Amino acid sequence: MCIRDSQLPVLQRLHLWLLSLLYLATFGSFIGFSAGFAMLAKTQFPDVNILRLAFFGPFIGAIARSVGGAISDKFGGVRVTLINFIFMAIFSALLFLTLPGTGSGNFIAFYAVFMGLFLTAGLGSGSTFQMIAVIFRQITIYRVKMKGGSDEQAQREAVTETAAALGFISAIGAVGGFFIPQAFGMSLNMTGSPVGAMKVFLIFYIVCVLLTWLVYGRRKFSQK
């Protein structure tokens, strides 16, 4: 990714970093789960041939991404993203109940819940991407108009800053592809269980619920 000098001011926008966090939680989760699901399933349910089933998750997430964008165009990216994060937190919490503990665990429940995570991560990556485009266009036009700029200038700068934001945030989201498998691996090495990593993910999704609601869920938000 390369940001030109004319696009550098976008790095000073608070919303760039907030939306990067939300996109990391959705798109990052999608590619991270895609990379780590088979490994996690194999360690928790070694008797199951997960290779025959692992591809369904990424497939569901990829289809859901397009659906998430389409739904957001109709109902609003903020609303869809908020509801989606709530479900991601719920599925993350349910995952604890499916893992082997004192018993052998429940693979069918584990698989079903994880498919739910793939679905919501895919939907969320589409809805947050739509949020980024809409919000950056709004705040850029507002900022230029407040400085006395013309409609043409506002539209031109909105295109430039939105494109820069989408490129930068997309790169941040890709970090999840590295972080999630590493988190699972570290938790397994330290405790023999993925529970530690899952607790971090659950807390992260709850934070994203609060962030989406408090910053973007209200009718007006700071235009900085």
Enumerate the predicted regions with their spans.
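Short, small-residue-biased leader/transition segments that mark boundaries at the very start
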Residues: M1-I3
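Extracytoplasmic gate region of multi-pass secondary transporters
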Residues: R13-A62, S125, F129-Q130, I180-P181
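Transmembrane alpha-helical cores of Major Facilitator Superfamily
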Residues: L24, F55-F59, I86, G167-V175
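Helix-to-loop junctions at the C-terminal end of transmembrane segments
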Residues: R65-G77
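C-terminal transmembrane helical hairpin of 12-TM major facilitator-type secondary transporters
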Residues: V78-T128
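Intracellular juxtamembrane helix-capping segments at the cytosolic ends
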Residues: L123-Q153
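A late C-terminal transmembrane helix in Major Facilitator Superfamily
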Residues: M146-M190
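A membrane-interface helix-boundary motif in multi-pass transporters
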Residues: F184-Y205
